Curated annotation (Swiss-Prot):
It is found in: Cytoplasm. It catalyses: DNA(n) + a 2'-deoxyribonucleoside 5'-triphosphate = DNA(n+1) + diphosphate. Its main location: cytoplasm. Binds 2 magnesium ions per subunit. Mg(2+) binds at residues 8, 103. It comes from Shewanella sediminis (strain HAW-EB3). The gene is dinB. This is DNA polymerase IV.
Amino acid sequence: MKKIIHIDMDCYFAAVEMRDFPELRGKPIAVGGRSDRRGVISTCNYEARKFGVRSAMASGYALKLCPDLILVPGRMSVYKEVSAQIREVFSHYTDLIEPLSLDEAYLDVTDCTQCQGSATLIAEAIRQEIFELTGLTASAGIAPIKFLAKIASDLNKPNGQYVITPNMIPAFVKDLPLIKIPGVGKVTGKKLEDIGLITCSDLQAYPEAALIERFGKFGSVLIERAQGIDTRNISPHRERKSVGVETTLAKDIYSLEQCQGVMPQLIQELATRIKRSAKDRTIHKQVVKLKFNDFKQTTIEHRSDEVSVKLFYDLLSQALERQQGRGIRLLGVSVGLASQSDIKTAEENEVRESQMDLGF
């Protein structure tokens, strides 16, 4: 049985700001863009959360909820530097580290002999070492499988940890809300709720074939998670799945021509990011994203094995068909990156087709 730890830093960006600027401590703060520039909250501290402020919320709305909220501009270079220090701490205990972002990661400590081999004690030691090195607190979840470790890390925040032992799994997942499963967002959660599926026990009793027919491959994943199954290993060299860029506009725009005026800069920035972080990867789709002034969003995608500027403009036109008179506050473009397993499967299929053509 594996021993998996999920480490999640507590309100990371905001915590770094409070560490570096002590005068911010005890006050509601948020890291994000200015409200007069249509900024969005990246993260906020617990004082701000008491007022209902949340990540991804418009800064202007956050200020309405909490008029005394202090907006702090992000310092990404500092956050990356501290993140590197945190990952160095992880390496003191295991080489099997799967970063999910700057402030969270999975660790497989199954073979770690420190702390008597106890994952619970290892998590405590990691959190203490992070605090001594950076002055920041972290929360941890400990479980035999990844998705439960991630859920557990959120159960005793801030600066705490929660353990799910193997014999606890059946009872734990029985009453677990499906919305808590990583990958089940608001949209999927609503679809599940519409067919009477709220908890994992509800899903356990649902016909498997019907679930797969409705949700495809993700239906199979849901069936496994509802039974407390997750066979994924820690991936130290986790493949990036996409590269994208988006911009929140200073004012709502409404016409195709206005949107087209924003596209060249976005596409140029996307090209730069692809060269920087995915130049050797294979592209398999292009995506255009719009967020409207009611904060609902839509995406349009199309298969593509190379970046086509024309395709981005075609997708933009299709996305605007869903506008329904609403103003557009955000526009984004991205590409999906094929995984190595996808490429291998495609190559194997090509070989099979060639063999069939040759009469093998």
